[in-house]
Amino acid sequence: MNESIECDVLVIGSGAGGLATAITARKAGLDVIVAEKEPVFGGTTAFSGGVLWIPGSPHGRRQNAADNREAAREYLRHECGAFFDAAAVDAFLDHAPAMVEWFERETCVKFVPTLYPDYHPTAPGGVDIGRSILAAPFDIRELGADMARLRPPLATITFIGMMFNSSNADLKHFFNAAKSLASAWYVCKRLVTHLKELALYRRGIQVTSGNALAARLAKSALDLGVPLWTGSPARRLVTERGAVRGAELQRDGKTVIVRARHAVVLACGGFPHDRARIGRAYPHLARGGEHHSPVPEGNTGDGI
């Protein structure tokens, strides 16, 4: 006998998009469930650099008061070329700064400015500072028992599991450790602290970048009482009269039908680990080429 559960909104996927959706829906008074196929939450976000490009954010306005909406729009028009979508760009520029303010006001998600320029700062409308922000560093002990379910960061962007804070002088101290006594002392203290964390928790607990963003979003969702079902892959969507009404999940070895009264949100990523689909999208693979992606192996295009 299949188990059946009802909610208002079912979110499939636990990266930044899925968790942000779940938090927003829960804040609106809706009953939300987040289902994640892998045993850890955070998705590709937890592996990523976690940089948000948000022209006009509160942090950006303080960092570069000369920047403005019109310049950001001109930059996007130049970068997008024939793919420029005026309605989508205007919606983004109008609402993205308010999104940042809302999350900082309503949740434990906090951001910090960065020194990153636009990808092409000399292009029309481009700037060399003020549009990119990062989640503030986070101590994952605040997740309590759920700390073990946060996807660890990508190993290649850590040093023996230690993450770096690119929004301050952290990295500079490591680069200057052989040249400056102050930097050498800073690095020694960081290493000792990190080794203690490894001994106690078997992982670094001071996280940055995308791992901090995923952790802060997860903490906010959990504090709101949103269930984060890990190890619960969606097998199929449930439809009635041509409309999606829920999804069939595998959870704890059982089939669970989750019926959503308002919406099913597919926030389960792309298909970098579906070789057949990649082969159809990139014909040159037939000639011997191959794409390798560092994203989690669970990204197989389930929602496409």
Task: Describe each model-derived feature in a short phrase.
Residues 1-9, 27, 211, 215:
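Extreme N-terminal leader/targeting segments of oxidoreductases
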